[in-house]
Regions:
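Short glycine-rich anion-binding loops that position phosphate/pyrophosphate groups of nucleotides
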Residues: 91, 161-164
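A short, aliphatic-rich alpha-helical micro-motif
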Residues: 149-151
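Conserved acidic residues
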Residues: 154
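Short, charged early-sequence alpha-helical segments and their helix-coil boundaries
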Residues: 45-73, 79
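A short N-terminal interaction module
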Residues: 2-39
């Protein structure tokens, strides 16, 4: 049965559109921003079983897509390197990797993540394991990837979903074979967390001219 947004949720969507218009003012026009948030909303409603997180997720998904669109329309020589981390559910490995990339790369790298079959929430064992090392991913929500985001990324890291990812010429694709944290305890997730840190550090060392934060 199709999801129907409440009056309050529809108001939240309008407020989200206003925030995005302020954020991208002077860069993207109002029509483009409204088209992207409406398209993002339609995509998410088509997948959802509940409307609870739809307004927040639609805003975040649209923001990432608009960030990607700005990259695609900009001079490549003026841009930071960008990485897209993909796994099946965008609930464990890709969220942890994105968390590490943001922590270690700071504002010198643009980070995106997504999943081929997004879960309802981020894996709690992954959240706890990352919090132990000072990386907060508790506020993240799994989301799908979009064509603009894939095209805007310089490096696309897949973890268990490579066959589902569209291939574009000129992109660098890397497949990381790592255990899926799903169903694992915090103790079992820690080695995955630490291996992701090592791999993200190595990737950032290739992409960034200065040493990464440790």
């Amino acid at each position: 049965m199709p999801i129907t947004l409440t009056t309050g949720e529809q108001l939240q969507i309008r407020q989200a559109a206003e925030r995005l218009q302020r954020q991208f003012s002077g860069t993207l026009n109002t029509e483009t921003i409204e088209r992207f948030i409406n398209d993002s909303l339609d995509t998410l409603v088509g997948r959802a079983t509940t409307s609870t997180w739809i307004p927040l997720l639609a805003e975040r998904f649209a923001r990432d897509r608009l960030r990607a669109l700005v990259r695609l329309e900009s001079d490549p020589t003026t841009l930071n390197p960008s990485i897209l981390f993909l796994c099946v559910h965008n609930a464990g490995r890709s969220q942890m990797a994105a968390g590490w990339a943001k922590r270690l790369g700071g504002d010198r790298v643009d980070v995106f993540s997504g999943g081929s079959e997004p879960a309802d929430q981020v894996n709690q064992a992954a959240v706890t394991a990352m919090a132990e090392v000072g990386v907060n991913i508790s506020g993240e929500i799994p989301q799908p990837w979009a064509d603009e985001i894939v095209r805007a990324a310089d490096v696309i890291v897949t973890m268990g979903c490579g066959d589902a990812c569209p291939v574009y010429p000129g992109k660098r694709y890397i497949d990381w074979e790592l255990d899926d944290p799903s169903g694992k305890t915090v103790e079992e997730v820690r080695p995955i967390r630490d291996e992701l840190e090592r791999r993200v550090q190595g990737l950032l060392a290739e992409l960034l001219p200065e040493p990464t934060v440790t």
